[in-house]
Structures are given as C-alpha cells and as structure tokens.
Amino acid sequence: MTAIRYEFIKKCKQTGARLGRVHTPHGSFDTPTFMPVGTLATVKTMSPEELKAMDSGIILSNTYHLWLRPGHEIVREAGGLHKFMNWDRAILTDSGGFQVFSLSDFRRIEEEGVYFRNHLNGDKLFLSPEKAMEIQNALGSDIMMAFDECPPFPATFEYMKKSVERTSRWAERCLNAHQRPEDQGLFGIVQGGEFEELRRQSAKDLVSMDFPGYAVGGLSVGEPKDIMNRVLEFTTPLLPENKPRYLMGVGSPDSLIDGAIRGIDMFDCVLPTRIARNGTCMTSQGRLVVKNAKFARDFGPLDPNCDCYTCKNYSRAYIRHLMKCDETFGIRLTSYHNLHFLLNLMEQVRQAIREDRLGDFREEFFEQYGFNKPNAKNF
C-alpha cells in the first residue's frame, strides 16, 4: 500500500480546477493547498500550535539545510522530523537540489551527482540521488522529493535537453534507493524549462516510473508569470488525474489562484514569512508596507476583512512601532498574518471550486487586490 493517496472530489465547471484531498501517514489535507515553509524544522517565528490554529495541514522542510544542521542522523535519533519539531501533521521535504544549484558559488555536475561547496563554511560536499534519499528517509517526512537538476532561467534547449535526461535517470535512481515506500511517498519532478517538447518528455519518463505524486519544477526562477502559466497549461494535463500535483516555489496570491485554475493541488514558498520580516503584508486590499510613516497613527488592523490573531488584537500603528524598533514580536505578528492570509485564500479557492465559480472569484480577487492595474505592485 502506498504512503500517499489522492482523493479526487470534484472539478470546477467554470475553470477545470480540482478539489481533492491528500491522505498521508500523518493525516489528510484538502487541496488546493499552500504549504508554509519550515526550512530548518521551524516556520520562522511560528509555533506548531499557531500553524494548527491557521489550519495548516502540511508544512515543508529542507533536506539540504537539515543535512548541514543539525544533521539527518540527529533527527533520526530524535525519532524523525515530526517528533523533533513536535508537529504531528504532514511534512514534505524537498530533495536539496534547488539549494545546491542556487546557494553554492562552486558546483560541478557529474552523472553520479553534484559536487559543491557548503554555503556556510566553504567545505566541499557531494549530493547524489542516493544521498538525498538516505537523508530524507532519516528525516521521515510523509512526502519526499526526487533529486533533480535545477537549471536557471533562461537556459538553451540543448542544455535543458541534457538536464531533463539526467533528471529522469536520477529519478529512477531515487526510486531504487528509497528505503521506506510504505510510509514515505516519493514525488518525481517534471523539468524542461519553457520548452513544451522537453516538458512532455520529462513527464512521459516520470509517469512511466509510477510515482505516488508529481511536481512541476523549474518555474518561479525568474521567468515572467505569463510564461509560468503557459508552461502549466501544457504540462499539468500530462500528469495523472489520480495523483497529487505540486508546483514548487510559488506563493504569491495571484499565482496560487492561477496555478489552481491550471490543475495544481499543492504550492509552497518562503514569500509570506520573508516579506513579513520587512513589514510587507498581504491584505484583501492589496500589498501593505506597515513600516510606512502614514501608519504611525493608524489604529486599525492590518486588514479589516481578516479575522486572524494579529488583526483581532493589534493595530497597524503598534506593529509599525515594533518593526521600526526591530522587535521580534512585530515579525511574529506580520508572519502570522501573511500565513493566515494565504491559507485562508486557499480555503476561499476551494469553496469557489465547490460552487463552480473560481473564474468569477479570480476576477473579483484580482480587481480588489489591484493585480489588474497597470504597474500593479507585486511580490
């Protein structure tokens, strides 16, 4: 029996977006969903109890960072990631591939894996499909990701073709090295950049390997949003209807809605907590930078339409004061609000799918948020 099972519930008649549920060894979560990112086994400044209060059913942790600190063997000795961080709901771990390609100044890609330098101290390291599986098996996440090559945008067709072929070979090695398929589901990652032919080849290779789920990788790496949407339009239909589909590294409100419309079930991004640390908040009226001087005497909530802990209890003026004084509590309040905003947005997306009106919801939300305006400020 597979560790991960996707239950299809319904399709939106207006857009084709799908409502579903993913069942894991640590509970089920409704889709489409957003996964808060807990890189180092913590969602920055948030407690597990606060994440549960927001109704987060799954979070993401990072294989590369946990391998370096504290080390996957320590996490294994603690009883796995769930016990180590006191989180009894689902966890997804990425493979470390993206970090190897984005954080390391020096790297050498060979067929056996990638040689690179530790971004913390410069030590030489080596990560392979087998090592990525060993680390993730020790971490004990519910969903683990295959080790893939993450080419930058833009890349030539020739380079991307070689990269896709290598990613497929690595995916097969990941399947062979995976030691715990009965309680950890391994997802394959479709690559291919903006090239339809290569996406088609990558999807065909991976679907033939019968992974329990599939991710679309290599997007949200600097390409314009219209390219991302176009790639999703020709990639998502290549993936099995009875498996979850995950768009990696995407977390802006407009992209979550547009991704759901194109058949995506799962999203993750550091965006909500990263921008929160600079005082940037997502609200139903659009982007709000609470550090701005105009909020010094504004005693209203960050978002009058939000019922989160932050908005029910604290004013813009108070949060601005905390942020200007570099008080950690200010970052906690903005982080809580942004995470709640995205998780609540996904609940609204699911409700719109239930009611067959996601296209209308998108139009209303984009208008209210200001995404339709020329020169609209995005994240």
Curated annotation (Swiss-Prot):
Reactions accelerated catalytically: 7-aminomethyl-7-carbaguanine + guanosine(34) in tRNA = 7-aminomethyl-7-carbaguanosine(34) in tRNA + guanine
GO molecular function: metal ion binding; tRNA-guanosine(34) queuine transglycosylase activity
Active site: 94 (proton acceptor), 268 (nucleophile)
Cofactor note: Binds 1 zinc ion per subunit.
Residues that hold substrate according to the record: 94-98, 148, 191, 218
Keyword Heme attached: no
One Pfam family of this chain: TGT
Pathway entry: tRNA modification; tRNA-queuosine biosynthesis
Keywords: Glycosyltransferase, Metal-binding, Queuosine biosynthesis, Transferase, tRNA processing, Zinc
GO CC annotations on file: cytosol
Family, per entry: Belongs to the queuine tRNA-ribosyltransferase family.
Role description: Catalyzes the base-exchange of a guanine (G) residue with the queuine precursor 7-aminomethyl-7-deazaguanine (PreQ1) at position 34 (anticodon wobble position) in tRNAs with GU(N) anticodons (tRNA-Asp, -Asn, -His and -Tyr). Catalysis occurs through a double-displacement mechanism. The nucleophile active site attacks the C1' of nucleotide 34 to detach the guanine base from the RNA, forming a covalent enzyme-RNA intermediate. The proton acceptor active site deprotonates the incoming PreQ1, allowing a nucleophilic attack on the C1' of the ribose to form the product.
Assembly and interaction partners: Homodimer. Within each dimer, one monomer is responsible for RNA recognition and catalysis, while the other monomer binds to the replacement base PreQ1.
The protein's name: Queuine tRNA-ribosyltransferase
